[in-house]
């Protein structure tokens, strides 16, 4: 295995052995640099990952800016439940990959003042995009949050320009769920949601 520097249509720095090659290369055909490999003497060089100076990384032979992964973020947030005044659990975790946000919420109110307001979880980590690619969530756990007759009809919707999850009823999802709806149990019960959506400017 030996160290090589080459200059042909770009600058390449790499390690070469009898059957394998790894290299880092600036290229004249793109504004960035690639990390590549050759698996054997009988194979051709193949870029595995390209870092674009405009931002982001691409994979394989793809160097299109539109396809670059230009954002990755992990974090926590504090969701709130409308009409809740105190909490036992108030957990939120998210991962943002490119133009999608994936999240986990566990929330349980210990005190509340139910009203005719819609049942809404507020405080998502990013505002949703202003387009028709709507987001949503599914319930992976609910301890007596909804009655057995109402729970099957509940949808969790994230609309345009929103940082809220709204609970809706019915097969067409047009009716809002009020926090004092008698089909639902006290806000003191726990719910766990997972979901995803496109953020604004994502």
Give the positions of each predicted feature.
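Carbohydrate-binding surface patches
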Residues: 98-107
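Terminal (often C-terminal
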Residues: 59-98
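Extracellular jelly-roll beta-sandwich "head" domains, especially the C-terminal globular C1q domain
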Residues: 40, 52, 60-64, 87-91, ...
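Trimeric beta-solenoid/beta-helix "fiber body" segments of extracellular/virion adhesins
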Residues: 1-71, 113-115, 131, 171-173, ...
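A broad, low-specificity signal marking well-ordered, structured residues that form hydrophobic/aromatic
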Residues: 22, 33, 49, 75, ...
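Short, solvent-exposed secondary-structure boundary motifs
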Residues: 7-20, 36-44, 73-89, 137-151
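Short, exposed beta-strand/loop patches in secreted or surface proteins that constitute
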Residues: 4-5, 24-26, 49, 91-95, ...
